[in-house]
């Protein structure tokens, strides 16, 4: 699946935008957010087996840009990538940019959450102020870059609630009694860090593309 790259036909190029993530939860949220744009949203899966980008940035924004540029070069298409994670005050901001692999390179939600609970136990707290943070970066084939950020503030507790969402959602309380994992998809998109960043990106893309 190739994308034309001539600057003269920029509008044609922009009708196809690759969502540069292999995370199904993120992909679903991003496809829904960009549904209102008259462009073709494409998954990385359409391009076969692609290597992972080396996410060695020190911030979410740096990692998002690394991924967007990497997959733009691999696919020849404009790309949108995000990097997001959890920052827990009692843990000095951890897991931060290491949220996806907090428990190691092959970590999953279960092992990452177990690691989170052990770290809270280590500092002898049952709950802590925390935030979810998302950086979203769009990179066009001509090098044009757009960037947005979203933040959702809450409390991390050592008691899980809810079956929805993914990542640390069952432990992330948006108020005293309700976690991100207990929200409907529509409710989550309204207040989540990624939902905020995506709405800002949609606005920027409307101005840029049309």
Where are these regions (language model features)?
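Anionic-ligand binding patches
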Residues: 15-18, 24-210
């Amino acid at each position: 699946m190739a994308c034309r790259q001539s600057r003269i036909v920029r509008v044609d190029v922009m009708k196809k935008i690759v969502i540069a993530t292999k995370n199904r939860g993120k992909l679903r949220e991003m496809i829904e957010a960009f549904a209102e744009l008259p462009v073709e949203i494409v998954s990385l899966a359409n391009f076969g087996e692609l290597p992972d980008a080396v996410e060695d940035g020190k911030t979410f924004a740096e990692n998002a840009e690394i991924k967007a540029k990497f997959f733009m070069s691999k696919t020849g298409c404009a790309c949108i990538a995000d990097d997001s994670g959890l920052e827990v005050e009692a843990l000095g901001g951890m897991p931060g940019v290491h949220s996806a692999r907090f428990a190691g390179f092959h970590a999953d939600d279960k092992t990452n959450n177990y690691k989170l609970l052990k770290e809270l136990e280590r500092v002898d707290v049952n709950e802590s102020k925390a935030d979810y943070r998302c950086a979203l970066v769009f990179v066009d084939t001509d090098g044009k870059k757009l960037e947005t950020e979203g933040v959702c503030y809450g409390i991390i507790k050592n008691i899980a609630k809810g079956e929805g969402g993914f990542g640390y959602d069952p432990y992330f309380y948006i108020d005293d009694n309700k976690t991100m994992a207990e929200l409907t998809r529509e409710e989550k998109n309204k207040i989540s860090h990624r939902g905020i960043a995506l709405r800002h990106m949609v606005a920027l893309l409307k101005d840029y593309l049309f």
